[in-house]
From Swiss-Prot:
Keyword Membrane included in the entry's annotation: yes
GO molecular function annotations of the record: toxin activity
Keyword Membrane: yes
Protein name: M-poneritoxin-Nc3a
Family the UniProt entry places it in: Belongs to the ponericin-G family.
A Gene Ontology biological process term: defense response to bacterium
Family matches, as Pfam families: Ponericin (PF07442)
Superkingdom, taxonomy of origin: Eukaryota
Keywords: Antibiotic, Antimicrobial, Membrane, Secreted, Target cell membrane, Target membrane, Toxin
Functional description taken from the UniProt entry: Membrane-perturbating peptide with multiple activities. It is insecticidal, since it induces contractile paralysis in insects (L.cuprina) during several hours and death after 24 hours. It shows a relatively strong and broad-spectrum antibacterial activity against both Gram-positive and Gram-negative bacteria (MIC<20 uM). It is also antiparasitic, since it potently inhibits the larval development of the major pathogenic nematode of ruminants (H.contortus, IC(50)=5.6 uM) and reduces the motility of adult males of the other nematode B.malayi.
UniProt organism field: Neoponera commutata
Length: 30
């Protein structure tokens, strides 16, 4: 169900969020 998907998304963001933000910041700077 959508709740399972939501939990997976939350876990993914918890793991990858900082990485993605760093990449976005680097892209914005360059």
């Amino acid at each position: 169900g959508w709740k399972d998907w939501l939990n997976k998304a939350k876990d993914f963001i918890k793991e990858k969020g900082p990485e993605i933000l760093r990449a976005a910041a680097n892209a914005a700077i360059n």
